C-alpha cells in the first residue's frame, strides 16, 4: 500500500553535518530498520525516534511503544533521545481521536520505561478512566 521503505544509511553522514540540534527518523513504520546505524553515526545531535506509526489507524499499545524505546536506548544515549511520532498525524482518515489515543500510548509507554529506569513518570490525565471519552458505566 505504501512505497518501499528506504534506508537512511546513505544519508546519515550528511545528516550529521546539517546545522540542526535534532534529527528525527521514522523508525516505527520501518521496524527500526536503521536504528543501530543511526546510533552509531549520529553522535553529536539529539535523535528523534518515531515510536508511533502515522501510516496506520491501529493504536500502538504502551507495551509496544516501550519496546521501541528500549530498542532505541540500546543505540542512542538517553540524554540525546527524543521520542516522537514517525510523522504528523494529519494523514487522510486519521481522526483526532486516533491521534489522541496514539499520543496517550506514547506517554504511557514512556512511563513504563521511565519506571524501569527509576525515573519520575509524567502525569497522563488522558489515560485516567475518570476523563475517558468512552462511557464505562
How would you name each of these model-derived features?
Residues 1-137:
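Domain-level signal for soluble alpha/beta catalytic cores
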